[in-house]
């Protein structure tokens, strides 16, 4: 059994114990006691969903990009809880906002979902890919199929801390495509957690476009202000 499966089972067990023994629930963000929901009303109102639409233009190509909001405050806290604290509840909450955006804006424009793959080292350390977690929840909510279409051909340096020029150089030619039969003639939506320079999204989309996909978009939880 993989570490990712173990963490999911642990979340389920914790939920069952909470129900049986009446363990107090806390707001996932501020950790104050919250009787009726996983997010208190104060934190819920502070989640700033503004639906950012932008274009990533590079090498004379354009990629349409969507993000729920900017990377900071409550959105950032939820992303970090999913990514580093292994809170699948945080992932489910974020995915619900992403699903709402898709149903309102992209439902008739998307045939299949996929996600940005983790490097082998990140997957080994974390035990799961947070983008895949989001993608699974979104697929179920929106009733859009998802498939693992990308993998990293080699482990690049972590993008965190690199300037924009080095980000583009570091990630170029990193992505390879699999399950090609699910791509040809399809409109593909790639799911990611945070977009910064756009280099990762651009080269992931470019790899898919080369397999005769009809169109490729990217949807992220947040967009960095950098």
What do the predicted segments below correspond to?
Residues 1-192, 196-226:
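Glycine-rich phosphate/pyrophosphate-handling loop used in enzymes and phosphotransfer proteins
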